[in-house]
């Protein structure tokens, strides 16, 4: 899977929500405890869009992301940042024919991502939403449109996890910085957008904290701990 080792080994981290809410892993048990896979029909429709648009495709199976060889070899050519390129090279498994690969595993996919230019995002979103059944479309970075099952999404999956742990939304806190975090931030009482987050994220969140480079998470936690005390 693509969960960084530093996250898996970080003290106190017991569960990890991945694939934009498509799955939950138990760190202690080392296995998946929840999943919401794409439907076969959705995958086949996504492949048709990929062939028409000729965009790079990523697919995730059991937490492992696969992508086209040229993209994994040089992500910066596809508008990835320098940091993003390192992450892509370290986590993505290259595939020669991504459409054939996706078709072969059509009933196993956690999620699908389209790598696109920023100016194509709105048009692509409209196409995906119109042409692919039973999906949830979101975005975490400017050059990606991410597709999951309609019942996925970080917010819905966080609610599932809270119920499992017998924690109410009034007792939960979440932090995020991108559009794909909005459903999570609005599903709990203490949902906080990072100061460096996207405009949509900051507008939607109940609270906004400082940036990630200025200890925004720590400041957000301390803000409400002081109120409790």
Please describe what each predicted stretch is:
Residues 3, 43, 121, 125, ...:
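A general structural signal for well-ordered alpha-helical segments in protein cores
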Residues 39, 114-117, 178, 213-214:
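Short beta->alpha junction loops/turns
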Residues 9-10, 106, 166, 202:
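Alpha-helix termination/capping residues and helix-transition junctions
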Residues 49, 55-56, 60-175:
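Conserved acidic, metal-coordinating active-site core of Asp-based
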Residues 13-19, 77-79, 136-138, 191-195, ...:
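Short hydrophobic/aromatic-enriched beta-strand-loop microsegments
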Residues 130, 145-229:
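Mg2+-dependent phosphoryl-transfer enzymes with acidic/Ser/Thr/Gly-rich catalytic loops
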